[in-house]
């Protein structure tokens, strides 16, 4: 075997995490605080649920209503994605440089054009087709079928948010701590983005089907990442690598046993498309700059920590993060192509935008590992930019969503 192709040993993962990001120490402190709250052990104490801070009661009910509507949708339901939105009309009219009169302004000050069967829209469809054709990784002739299949899968593999929200309070708190730990490990091993999002989907689906004691939450998180890596990576980490990451808390036999059990509970169903697929499609269509793409990725990872975002489809989550990023960067328009591809307009995303902004207020308590990751020069310090923007827009953060 060629030594150049040999996978680099992961001996420095635990040291890097604990010394550089200090994720391990932060997670352990969170676990101890939760476990000792009120002098009770998380295994025998059901803490009361927290109230929904930062969004109104109307938005809270809307989030639950949206989730219920997803469950009510049959898997065989076809996407409203017509041939007109993908195929070029040969008789397209020239686009006008004048702003459409059918335009409203959002509370963020961004012009939102309403869909209209006019010449500008037809010309935009032609441009969309040209952008598809320019990217060799996109098969234009199969785009409609691929999107339709992805839409069905994202509904099929959604976790049961109602069961997760009914879990004891310590489960929600420890889930956030474990996800921050997973992000730190994922960053150190330099895994694919798909592996991270799939691992959280596997973990959430497992938590929505099984009651997990606090003592095994970290083992479940590590195993979920292990399963996702086997599905997505060319060179996934080994059991020995995970033992090093877990620093002796669990041995290989425990990891393999949990892996078998989780796959059995999930019936070996791992085909969740995830937000990365939708993000890449929207990036091709909209020609987004790198700053906006990185910001959306940051928001997507932040949403992993907040359990309430598990009630969203992957495509809806991407649309929420995209609109928030466009708002912060003061993009001129809420692009018509985004509603065309995802099927979500601005008004259907308001509640989730407010929830995301609330999560971004205090990154050091909510998503320490993710903030540290995106504060590095590699990601252009995007998390610091977002934090500075929020600090100077306190009036926006005080909105009640009415």
Swiss-Prot record:
Gene Ontology process terms (BP): cell division; nuclear DNA replication; reciprocal meiotic recombination; regulation of meiotic cell cycle; signaling
SMART domains: CYCLIN (SM00385), Cyclin_C (SM01332)
Keyword match Cell division: yes
Matching PROSITE patterns: CYCLINS
GO cellular component: cyclin-dependent protein kinase holoenzyme complex; cytoplasm; cytosol; microtubule organizing center; nuclear envelope; nucleus
UniProt-recorded name of the protein: Meiosis-specific cyclin rem1
Top-level division of the source organism's lineage: Eukaryota
Key words, A-Z: Cell cycle, Cell division, Cyclin, Meiosis
One MF term in the entry's GO annotations: cyclin-dependent protein serine/threonine kinase regulator activity
General function of this protein: Required for pre-meiotic DNA synthesis and S phase progression. Regulates levels of meiotic intragenic recombination.
Family that this chain belongs to: Belongs to the cyclin family. Cyclin AB subfamily.
InterPro entries for the chain: Cyclin, Cyclin-like_dom, Cyclin-like_sf, Cyclin_C-dom, Cyclin_N, Cyclins_cyclin-box
């Amino acid at each position: 075997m060629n030594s150049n192709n040999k996978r680099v040993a992961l001996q420095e993962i635990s040291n890097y995490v604990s010394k550089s990001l200090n994720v391990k120490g932060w997670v352990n402190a969170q676990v101890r605080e939760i476990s000792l709250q009120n002098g009770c052990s998380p295994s025998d104490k059901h803490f009361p649920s927290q109230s929904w801070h930062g969004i109104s009661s109307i938005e809270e009910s809307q989030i639950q209503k949206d989730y219920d509507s997803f469950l009510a949708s049959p898997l065989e339901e076809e996407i409203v994605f017509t041939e007109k939105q993908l195929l070029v009309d040969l008789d397209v009219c020239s686009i006008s440089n004048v702003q459409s009169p059918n335009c409203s302004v959002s509370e963020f000050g961004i012009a939102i054009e309403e869909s209209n069967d006019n010449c500008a829209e037809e010309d935009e469809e032609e441009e969309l087709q040209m952008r598809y054709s320019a990217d060799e990784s996109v098969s234009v002739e199969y785009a409609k079928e691929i999107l339709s299949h992805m839409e069905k899968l994202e509904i099929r593999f959604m976790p049961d948010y109602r069961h997760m929200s009914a879990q004891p309070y310590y489960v929600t708190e420890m889930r956030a701590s474990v996800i921050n730990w997973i992000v730190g490990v994922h960053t150190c091993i330099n895994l694919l983005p798909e592996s991270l999002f799939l691992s959280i989907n596997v973990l959430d689906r497992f938590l929505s089907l099984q009651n997990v004691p606090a003592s095994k939450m970290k083992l479940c998180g590590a195993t979920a990442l292990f399963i996702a890596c086997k599905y997505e990576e060319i060179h996934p980490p080994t059991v020995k690598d995970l033992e090093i990451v877990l620093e002796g808390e669990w041995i290989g036999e425990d990891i393999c046993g949990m892996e078998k059990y989780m796959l059995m509970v999930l019936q070996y169903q791992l085909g969740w498309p995830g937000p990365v697929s939708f993000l890449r499609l929207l990036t091709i269509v909209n020609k987004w700059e790198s700053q906006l793409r990185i910001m959306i990725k940051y928001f997507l990872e932040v949403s992993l920590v907040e359990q309430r975002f598990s009630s969203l489809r992957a495509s809806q989550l991407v649309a929420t993060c995209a609109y928030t990023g466009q708002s912060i960067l003061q993009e001129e328009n809420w692009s018509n192509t985004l509603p065309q591809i995802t099927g979500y307009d601005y008004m259907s995303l308001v509640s989730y935008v407010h929830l995301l902004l609330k999560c971004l207020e205090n990154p050091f308590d909510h998503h320490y590992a993710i903030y540290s990751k995106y504060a590095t020069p590699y990601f252009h310090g995007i998390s610091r930019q977002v934090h500075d923007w929020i600090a100077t827009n306190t009036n926006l953060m005080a909105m009640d969503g009415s």
